[in-house]
From Swiss-Prot:
Biased composition (Basic and acidic residues): 363-372, 439-456, 508-557
Bias (Polar residues): 410-434
Keywords: Cell projection, Cilium, Coiled coil, Cytoplasm, Cytoskeleton
Region (Disordered): 1-20, 287-573
Signal sequence segment: none
CC annotations in GO: axoneme; ciliary base
Tissue expression: Expressed in amphid and phasmid ciliated neurons.
Any Pfam family hit: ARL2_Bind_BART
Entry-linked InterPro entries: BART_dom, BART_sf, CFAP36
Entry protein name: Cilia- and flagella-associated protein 36
Family: Belongs to the CFAP36 family.
Length: 685
């Protein structure tokens, strides 16, 4: 009885314990929710995107109020989604939050609860957004310092390490790079030595001043935030003393704004957090003060000699009415000024006396004059000047004849073929002068053939250069070519040549020569009749003794000309080469021009047929490869199928296969029975 009575008395207390346990569980779920990414990511994205317009120098209250309304709607939406997921009402959530003990709040929950308090209190929202704006400016400044080279030398790559990554350059490119680098170095060496250290010191000083100013602004915003929280806590205490309650009893229909108000009143705690591990020291009030909009006096920097736009980050410093330096302007202008740097040329002591927004035009002009220019154009101008001088030098070296016309200087490579390719005018002049000399009985002038050209027949040279169409050329070629062993000085010199083999044999008299053919060297017919042994020989390079030693036996018929077995000559026409087309070969005095005439044969392969055949072979090869791949794939599939049909090696495997088959059979039977049942039912109905 006593036990029952005690249990009956403890039932109301047990019900209260269950309610408190449920509220604690709901509170723990809410704390987990505000530390999760579902809560933090939307809020962080909203703050980073909207914090750009929050600036102490340009207080736009209307814009701030509109952004605060959007932020409050975002917080209300997130809380509503949490209540729907958990299956509770906003009133129950507020009741659970009232049991929250502020002393048990960790630093992580303090940081997570700050956005919730900012949604209810406008004075907390504005400093939070301004602090985020300054943090973004600090991140941009740090990134720009890293890009500009203001980092320790340990983190930088040396010149030797960067050269290892360069690709191999050709000698011409290497010489060009060396020339450009020498020209630049000779021009910029003195300027870089004088200004390098000063620029680095000035950049480091400007960066330090900007960082200190931004850190000071962060401290100021934290003070304002703490003050707003204190005021909210005092107002809440006064409302509690008067017996007023901000909660509503009708839990389901309670507005979400009242929930946020209750949470803000419950979590009226110190949410000021430091973003860096650096210890800050407040400046003395004697260095200069600036009163903010909320009435808090904060120490600011006064001894800054940085003009607007000196840093590469583009963060400008504004000034107040007293001339003291204020906080940097908003980050909207950070991206537009990146890359623009105009370092002040004065000393730090002189810059301290100047206002932060003013700059002297004389100093700007001086800096513009002292700015080193690039030397690429100079190098290009030097190269162009050298090219002009070289072109002028080549024009002055051109010789001038008696008539005043310029002559092109001759080259040694074209001297050997000069007489063959001479113009008709020059050849006509030569032919006009030669008859007069012959008539006077003087020595005939030597021909202008080169040393190498003298050894070749006219047949080969005509195939190289082309047929002579000018009558003057024919007139000029009527004179026999000069030889090394010939010393004839009159016109009867060609008559002293030994007779041909037929004339020596006495079979018939030599053909009578007309006066026009007396001194004319006829080109032998070298197509089919060149095999005739009775044809006169035109190779002047063979000695006369060798010509006379040729057999005079005519009973042996000439050998027929068969197909060409091989052609030793496989290159271009080069005078002086041992296998050049102009040289006669063999005892029959055949040259390669005669041999090449027989290449037009029915058995010769056509290039188009060769290409068609090659294409056909490629297609056949591709088809064979495709068939081979298909056969290989087929073999692999057969192997896999055979592996599945192999006899199981263990009893467990065999049982597994049998069970699988049984299950499939049962499923099929069940499906058939279901179909039959449906058909029977439809027939009965």
């Amino acid at each position: 009885m006593l036990r029952r009575f005690s249990k009956k008395n403890k039932n109301p207390e047990g019900g209260s314990d269950d309610a408190s346990r449920k509220q604690k569980k709901l509170l723990s779920k809410f704390l987990e929710f505000i530390t999760s990414s579902i809560w933090s990511i939307p809020i962080a994205s909203f703050i980073e995107s909207q914090s750009v317009v929050f600036d102490r120098q340009q207080m736009e209250t209307d814009v701030y109020i509109m952004i605060h309304k959007e932020y409050s709607q975002l917080i209300d939406t997130l809380i509503e989604c949490f209540c729907e997921d958990v299956g509770t009402t906003p009133t129950e959530l507020v009741a659970a939050i009232q049991l929250f003990n502020q002393k048990d709040v960790s630093q992580q929950y303090k940081v997570a609860l700050e956005p919730l308090l900012a949604a209810q209190n406008f004075n907390v929202f504005v400093p939070m957004m301004m602090r985020k704006n300054i943090e973004l400016q600090l991140q941009a400044l740090q990134m720009i310092e890293f890009m500009c080279g203001l980092i320790p030398s340990v983190l930088q790559l040396e010149d030797g390490e960067t050269l290892r990554n360069m690709k191999k350059l050709s000698p011409e490119e290497t010489e060009r790079y060396v020339l450009i680098s020498v020209l630049r170095h000779s021009k910029d060496e003195y300027d870089s030595m004088q200004k390098g250290s000063e620029e680095l010191e000035m950049m480091a000083q400007n960066s330090r001043i900007q960082r200190e100013a931004l850190e000071q602004e962060i401290r100021k915003e934290e003070i304002l935030l703490q003050q707003a929280l204190d005021e909210g806590a005092r107002a809440q205490n006064q409302n509690q003393n008067q017996g007023t309650s901000s909660t509503q009893t009708d839990g389901v229909n309670a507005p979400l704004r009242s929930v946020a108000a209750m949470m803000a009143a419950t979590f009226a705690i110190d949410t000021a957090t430091s973003t860096d591990d650096v210890t800050y020291k407040f400046l003395d009030q004697s260095t200069g003060t600036m009163t903010s909009s909320t009435g808090v006096s904060v120490g600011t920097l006064t001894n800054t000699g940085v003009s607007s736009g000196t840093m590469t980050s583009g963060v400008d410093t504004g000034t107040d009415a007293d001339g003291t330096v204020g906080r940097p302007k908003s980050a909207k202008r950070v991206g537009s000024a990146v890359g623009k740097r105009s370092v002040s040329k004065g000393t730090p002591s002189e810059d301290a006396k100047k206002s932060s927004g003013s700059s002297s035009p004389d100093e700007a002009e001086k800096s513009k004059r002292e700015r080193p220019g690039t030397s690429v154009k100079k190098a290009i101008g030097i190269v162009a000047a050298n090219s002009e001088m070289s072109s002028n030098g080549t024009q002055m070296d051109v010789p001038v004849d008696e008539e005043g016309t310029k002559k092109r200087p001759g080259t040694t490579s074209k001297k050997s073929i000069a007489t063959v390719t001479a113009s008709p005018e020059m050849s006509s002049k030569t032919t006009q002068m030669e008859p007069e000399q012959d008539g006077e009985g003087k020595k005939r002038p030597e021909t202008s053939k080169g040393a190498n050209e003298r050894k070749y027949s006219n047949a080969g040279l005509e195939d190289i250069v082309g047929p002579k169409s000018s009558p003057h050329e024919e007139k000029k070629s009527s004179h026999p070519s000069s030889r090394k062993g010939s010393k004839a000085t009159d016109e009867n010199a060609p008559a002293t040549r030994p007779p041909s083999r037929k004339a020596a044999g006495g079979s018939h008299e030599p053909r009578a020569k007309t006066p026009n053919q007396k001194n004319k060297d006829e080109r032998p017919t070298t197509r089919r009749s060149s095999v005739d042994k009775n044809a006169p020989k035109r190779n002047d390079s063979v000695p006369r003794e060798r010509k006379s030693s040729v057999s005079h036996d005519e009973s042996k018929p000439p050998k027929p000309i068969g197909p060409l077995r091989g052609n030793k000559y496989d290159g271009d026409v080069v005078l002086g080469r041992a296998e050049s087309p102009g040289i006669d070969h063999g005892p029959r005095r055949k040259n390669l021009n005669d041999v090449n005439s027989h290449l037009v044969d029915t058995n010769r392969l056509n290039s188009s047929d060769v290409r068609v055949r090659a294409q056909y072979l490629r297609e056949q090869r591709d088809k064979l490869l495709q068939m081979k791949n298909a056969e290989r794939i087929k073999q692999m599939t057969d192997i896999q199928q055979n592996a599945s049909l192999e006899r199981p090696k263990t009893a467990a495997r065999a049982r597994e296969i049998l069970d699988k088959d049984k299950k499939e059979a049962v499923a099929i039977r069940k499906e058939i029975s279901d179909k039959l049942k449906t058909q029977i039912l439809t027939l009965h109905h």
